[in-house]
Amino acid sequence: MAGNSIGQFFRVTTFGESHGSALGGIIDGVPPSLPLTEKDLQYDLDRRRPGSSRYTSQRSELDTVEILSGVFNGKTTGTSIGLLIKNTDHRPQDYEKIKNLYRPGHADYTYEKKYGFRDYRGGGRSSARETAVRVAAGAVAKKYLFNKKNIKIRGFLAQMGDVHCNLKDWRQVNNNPFFCPDLEKLTALDTLINNLQKSGDSIGAKITVIAENIPIGLGEPVFDRLDADLAHALMSINAVKGVEIGDGFSVITKRGSEHRDEMTLDGFNSNNSGGILGGISNGQPIIMHIAIKPTSSITVPGKTITRENEETQVVTIGRHDPCIGIRVVPIAEAMVAIVVIDHLLRQRAQCEKI
């Protein structure tokens, strides 16, 4: 299987399956002498991990990360950093009854048609469980970016179903299980999730990520544009079906006189472009939105086919999220951080004195 790595100067490779013994990864390109401990990575892993609230999957993984290499006496050495996260609450027996059929909306069908064989235990490699290592790698990137350039990368739940969450207070995002910055919407979110859990259904979400203090000049025209790489990274997250940067699809109804970001000696008058012009960062905050589909692992019966090409019904058994978007926030932050640090290192290599 190809496609297990992302990045050029800062390169992340992951391995492992949902119900295998462990997940792991290798990070190449981390600059030396960055203070780093497992505690630095664990914070974001705890934000992502399942079983952390009654609103998410009750699979109870501690997601304890172990740094195997690349760190000595509390600092990075500049060599490859090896990471390991053991699976401690995997239950492959939950999938025995559905191993010979394809779960609609999942990668079961496409994986088997592509490879001729698949790991049916929770989706194997296609499971969002894989993203735990991405979050750990992203934590390394976030620490370097903040320490060296004061770059902040933060995300929040912008919408779940019909409930819209306004960015009122960043401080509240990590103080509630929804990553919601709008405390007035917590009751509505709670009601929505409770109703979904009772009905056995799920719902989609919109996540917003904002990267601040980005220096001007990150991005490599033409094919490695910063926005192209960000879209690539965000689309690689399980269940993401759409990416917007800046005004995104709302530009369809706007006039050029309205959308262009006019400039004065004091700076830009607006940020409709989302901080990127011509594929290169312009110094403004980079604003991204992603659409998360509702998980297909639900207890509502659905039509499907078996490996023997017979029609049947499926009712998903196991522990699943009524809204996977709740746990995507730290994953999206991680992917943005991985792209930003990669382009920062590329810029330093090519244009250090500029």
Swiss-Prot record:
Keyword NADP: yes
CDD domains: Chorismate_synthase
Complex formation: Homotetramer.
A biological process from GO: chorismate biosynthetic process
EC number: 4.2.3.5
Reaction catalysed by this enzyme: 5-O-(1-carboxyvinyl)-3-phosphoshikimate = chorismate + phosphate
Top EC category: lyase
Key words, A-Z: Amino-acid biosynthesis, Aromatic amino acid biosynthesis, FAD, Flavoprotein, FMN, Lyase, NADP
One Pfam family this sequence matches: Chorismate_synt
Cofactor(s) required for function per UniProt: FMNH2
Binding site for FMN: 125-127, 238-239, 278, 293-297, 319
UniProt remark on cofactor binding: Reduced FMN (FMNH(2)).
GO MF annotation, one: chorismate synthase activity
InterPro entries, per the entry: Chorismate_synth, Chorismate_synth_AroC_sf, Chorismate_synthase_CS
PROSITE patterns: CHORISMATE_SYNTHASE_1, CHORISMATE_SYNTHASE_2, CHORISMATE_SYNTHASE_3
Protease among keywords: no
Source organism of this protein record: Blochmanniella pennsylvanica (strain BPEN)
Gene name per UniProt: aroC
Single GO cellular component term: cytosol
Gene3D superfamilies assigned: Chorismate synthase AroC
Function: This reaction introduces a second double bond into the aromatic ring system.
Residues annotated as binding NADP(+): 48, 54
Protein name: Chorismate synthase
Annotated family: Belongs to the chorismate synthase family.
HAMAP family registered for this protein in UniProt: Chorismate_synth
Pathway terms, separated by semicolons: Metabolic intermediate biosynthesis; chorismate biosynthesis; chorismate from D-erythrose 4-phosphate and phosphoenolpyruvate: step 7/7
